[in-house]
Amino acid sequence: MLGWCEAIARNPHRIPNTTRTPETSGDVADASQTSTLNEKSPGRSASRSSNISKASSPTTGTAPRSQSRLSVCPSTQDICRICHCEGDEESPLITPCRCTGTLRFVHQSCLHQWIKSSDTRCCELCKYDFIMETKLKPLRKWEKLQMTTSERRKIFCSVTFHVIAVTCVVWSLYVLIDRTAEEIKQGNDNGVLEWPFWTKLVVVAIGFTGGLVFMYVQCKVYVQLWRRLKAYNRVIFVQNCPDTANKLEKNFPCNVNTEIKDAVVVPVPQTGSNTLPTAEGAPPEVIPV
C-alpha cells in the first residue's frame, strides 16, 4: 500500500481512469466543448457585434431621408414671385395680372422697383397691361438714374461729339451759304453762274441732310434717357387685376364652407350639477319631513 502511494506521488499523470471522479471528467468535457465552439464561430460573434452596432446607431441612415423630405415638401403659403417672401400688413401681396398659381402674387414695392428698372407697363409672362396710377415726384426730390460707368462714359462722349458736330455743321453751312450768296451776286452782274457754285450748293445740301439725320438719331437716344429718368422718379400704385380678384372672392367662401363642414362638434358634459334630469310628465318627488 505504501509503495502504491509513493508511485502516485512520484508520477501523478499515470493515475488510472477509474480513480477519477465523473464530476471532474464532465467539467473537462464542458470546457473543451466551449473552447471548440468559440474557435469555430468567430464569424457569428463578428456579425452579432456588427448588428448590435447598427442597432445602436439608427439615426445614421434615417437622418438624410428626413432632411431630403423637409427640403422637398413645398410651402403652402403665398409668396412674392420676385423676392420669394411672404406678405405682411406693411407690404401685402397683390395680384396685378392674369398669371395663376404661385406666380400671381407680388409685393407692391417689388413690382414698383421692377417697373422702374425695366420701363415696362405689362407683365412679361401673360402680357397683361397693369392698371396703374402714376404720379411724378417734385423736381426737388428727383433721384439720379442708376447707370453703370460704361453707360455714363458713352453718354458723355456722345453729348460731347454731338455738340462738336453741330458746331462744325453750322459753321460750314454758314461759310458756304455766305460764299454762295456772293457768287450769286457776281453771277447776276455777269449773267452766268460758274460750276463751283453748283458744287458748293450740293455740298451744303448733303451736309444739311447728314446733320438732320445725326440730330434725329441722337435726339431719339436722349428722349429714351428722359423717359427712363421720368419712370425712375415717379410714384406708381398698381391695382389688382379684376379677373383674379373675382376668382379669389369666389374661392374664399368655398374654402370657408368646406372648413365648416369638416369641423366636428364635440358635446361637453356639464360638470357643475350632479343631478340627473327628470323625465317629462313625471310627478315631483315628495320629501318626508
From Swiss-Prot:
Top EC category: transferase
Keywords assigned: Cytoplasmic vesicle, Endosome, Golgi apparatus, Immunity, Lysosome, Membrane, Metal-binding, Transferase, Transmembrane, Transmembrane helix, Ubl conjugation, Ubl conjugation pathway, Zinc, Zinc-finger
Any GO BP annotation: immune response
SMART domains membership: RINGv
Residues at which Zn(2+) 1 binds: C80, C83, H107, C110
The keyword Repressor is annotated on this UniProt entry: no
Catalytic activity: S-ubiquitinyl-[E2 ubiquitin-conjugating enzyme]-L-cysteine + [acceptor protein]-L-lysine = [E2 ubiquitin-conjugating enzyme]-L-cysteine + N(6)-ubiquitinyl-[acceptor protein]-L-lysine
Record field: transmembrane: 155-175, 197-217
Main location as per UniProt: membrane
Location of region: Disordered: 13-69
List of residues binding Zn(2+) 2: C97, C99, C123, C126
Substitution effect: Y232F: Almost complete loss of down-regulation of CD86 cell surface expression
Record PTM: Has a short half-life. Instability/short half-life permits rapid changes that allow efficient induction of antigen presentation once antigen presenting cells, APCs, receive maturation signals. Small changes in protein levels significantly alter the cell surface display of MHC class II proteins. Ubiquitinated via ubiquitin-conjugating enzyme E2 D1/UBE2D1 independently of lysines, leading to proteolytic degradation.
Bias-annotated ranges (Low complexity): 43-58
Consequence when changing W114A: Loss of ubiquitin ligase activity and loss of down-regulation of CD86 cell surface expression
SUPFAM superfamilies assigned: RING/U-box (SSF57850)
Stretches for region Responsible for down-regulation of CD86 and MHC class II cell surface expression: 222-279
Region (Responsible for low stability): 1-66
Molecular function as annotated in GO: MHC protein binding; ubiquitin protein ligase activity; ubiquitin-protein transferase activity; zinc ion binding
Polar residues bias (residue ranges): 59-69
Annotated domain remarks: The RING-CH-type zinc finger domain is required for E3 ligase activity.
PANTHER family: LD02310P
Subunit record text: Interacts with CD83; this interaction antagonizes MARCHF1-mediated MHC II and CD86 down-regulation.
Role of this protein: E3 ubiquitin-protein ligase that mediates ubiquitination of TFRC, CD86, FAS and MHC class II proteins, such as HLA-DR alpha and beta, and promotes their subsequent endocytosis and sorting to lysosomes via multivesicular bodies. By constitutively ubiquitinating MHC class II proteins in immature dendritic cells, down-regulates their cell surface localization thus sequestering them in the intracellular endosomal system. Also regulates insulin sensitivity by controlling surface expression of the insulin receptor subunit beta/INSR by direct ubiquitination and degradation.
Protein name from the UniProt record: E3 ubiquitin-protein ligase MARCHF1
Organism in which the protein naturally occurs: Mus musculus
